Amino acid sequence: MYALSEKGERIRAMFGSIAPRYDLLNRLLSLGIDRRWRRFAVKKIGLNGSGRVLDVATGTGDVALEIASQTPASVSIVGIDFTPEMIELGRVKVKDSRHCGRITLQVAPCEEIPFDDGSFDAATISFGIRNVVDRIKGLAEMHRVLKNDGKIVILEFSTPTLPVFKDLYHFYFLKVLPKIGGAFSRFSAYQYLPDSVLEFPSREVFKGMMTQVGFKDVRHFDLTGGIATVYVGTK
């Protein structure tokens, strides 16, 4: 069993504490834009026939459900997350959906995915890779469980490139967002969010990390002026 670092345990406990309000807060804080980002990311999977998709850091299952809505009924989805509270909420959401027979959720960390080599046709992780303490290990694990020619799609917050937009973004993330989040949940959790985004590697550095673990044809797509970025690669 993979043992999380002290930092990893703190992150897991933090997400556990905000789990009941996680979806509502994301809608409020992003003004609903995150839904469009997820739809765009899932389209990049490009799985039109039967297959199996792994959604890492699935949270309460939003991306797993989006994958189910965009793919044929012959596609099955497995969602994993290291936060039990998120998985519990996700299971309720999946059970109440029309896709309940296609999605299974379980507790597991990105750094030790409990599946055999070459088990999946595609893998996704949305707003989760920045919370993985050992990102190289997490990327390597996702690479391991993919079949040859399998695709990885990563959606993550990023820093805008336009100077004026970048300044406004930093002001919102550092000053406004933590206060809004703190009104609904633990202030420290929504102070962590902007800090984790701002310390995330640049697009080119992160693509280099993907290449380092074996992904090829790595590219990225900026969304909403670069507030979010989708990274795509192939095993």
From Swiss-Prot:
Top-level class of the enzyme under EC nomenclature: transferase
Example GO BP: menaquinone biosynthetic process
Catalytic function, reaction form: a 2-demethylmenaquinol + S-adenosyl-L-methionine = a menaquinol + S-adenosyl-L-homocysteine + H(+); a 2-methoxy-6-(all-trans-polyprenyl)benzene-1,4-diol + S-adenosyl-L-methionine = a 5-methoxy-2-methyl-3-(all-trans-polyprenyl)benzene-1,4-diol + S-adenosyl-L-homocysteine + H(+)
Taxonomic superkingdom: Bacteria
Residues the record lists as binding S-adenosyl-L-methionine: 60, 81, 126
A GO term for molecular function: demethylmenaquinone methyltransferase activity
Pfam families reported for this sequence: Ubie_methyltran
Pathway(s): Quinol/quinone metabolism; menaquinone biosynthesis; menaquinol from 1,4-dihydroxy-2-naphthoate: step 2/2; Cofactor biosynthesis; ubiquinone biosynthesis
This enzyme's EC code(s): 2.1.1.163, 2.1.1.201
Sorted UniProt keywords: Menaquinone biosynthesis, Methyltransferase, S-adenosyl-L-methionine, Transferase, Ubiquinone biosynthesis
Family of the protein in this entry: Belongs to the class I-like SAM-binding methyltransferase superfamily. MenG/UbiE family.
HAMAP family: MenG_UbiE_methyltr
Protein name: Ubiquinone/menaquinone biosynthesis C-methyltransferase UbiE
Organism encoding this protein: Citrifermentans bemidjiense (strain ATCC BAA-1014 / DSM 16622 / JCM 12645 / Bem) (Geobacter bemidjiensis)
Gene name as annotated: ubiE
